[in-house]
């Protein structure tokens, strides 16, 4: 278990650097292209997407249908990871079948894929949160879920902003507002739409819609699952949270060495 923790801490540090990476020229160009694409998409598409995201956000913040899982406590991080990866595999299969089915149905049925996929993703995040011992009945844990969502499906510039808050979430959560109006869901929905619009648009094309739908949904859920695992590792491996097994000696040694390197660089 000690060796496993050591490996996961190293992987986590690499992932953190990726989240802090500044937008590349390609990232910036892609954002400009997406803005142009938004201007030519049909109004019906924009209306359905905006409505779906708005309703989904309300469900995440206030709904109860996703909060049925009891947080799992007193198991090792490796056991949590195994449970999480099993859930991701299950939800990937579900998303692929859903994407292939709606993609084969033409434009009108294809449009229905967006809210269905949102629901699949949110259910997966609730499952993973409980696996890592967090109670999604807590409104602020739902905010963390939305942050994971944004981290996986946003431009790099927005990822940088979101990650700053997530990295110290357990210290900042006590200062978070309980008012839904303080959450920037406009930015949330626009970033998500911009991230997947092109792929979802291709899903509406006759002949290739089913293949694109299955492939894209599989990739999106896979990425979300990985980001969720890293996001909860960041809280469990970086804290003395009581739901985590006692921190191993090798983990403490790695953190000590890593922090010493950081101190030297800063000096």
Roles of regions detected by a PLM:
Residues 1-98, 126-267:
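Terminal, membrane-proximal amphipathic helices
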Residues 110-118, 212:
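Hydrophobic alpha-helical membrane segments of integral membrane proteins
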Residues 118-124:
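Structural signature of FAD isoalloxazine-binding scaffolds in flavoprotein oxidoreductases
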């Amino acid at each position: 278990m000690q060796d496993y923790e050591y490996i996961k801490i190293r992987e986590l540090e690499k992932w953190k650097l990726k989240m802090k990476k500044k937008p590349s020229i390609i990232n910036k160009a892609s954002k400009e292209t997406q803005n142009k694409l938004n201007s030519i998409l049909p109004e019906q598409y924009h209306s359905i997407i905006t409505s779906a995201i708005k309703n989904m956000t309300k469900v995440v913040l206030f709904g109860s249908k996703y909060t049925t899982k009891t947080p799992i406590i007193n198991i090792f991080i490796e056991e949590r990871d195994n449970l999480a990866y099993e859930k991701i595999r299950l939800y990937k299969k579900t998303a692929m079948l859903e994407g292939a089915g709606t993609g084969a149905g033409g434009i009108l049925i294809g449009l229905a894929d967006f809210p269905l996929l949102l629901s699949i993703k949110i259910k997966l995040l609730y499952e993973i949160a409980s696996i890592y011992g967090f109670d999604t009945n807590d409104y602020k844990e739902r905010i963390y879920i939305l942050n994971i969502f944004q981290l996986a499906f946003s431009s790099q510039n927005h990822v940088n902003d979101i990650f700053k808050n997530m990295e110290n979430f357990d210290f900042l959560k006590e200062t978070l507002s309980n008012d839904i109006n303080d959450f920037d869901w406009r930015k949330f929905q626009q970033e998500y739409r911009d991230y997947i619009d092109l792929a979802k648009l291709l899903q509406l094309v006759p002949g290739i819609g089913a293949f694109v739908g299955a492939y894209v949904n599989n990739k999106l859920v896979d990425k979300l699952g990985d980001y969720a695992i890293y996001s909860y590792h960041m809280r469990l491996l970086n804290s003395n949270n009581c739901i985590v097994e006692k921190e191993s000696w090798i983990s403490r040694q790695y953190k000590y060495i890593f922090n010493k390197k950081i101190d030297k660089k800063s000096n």
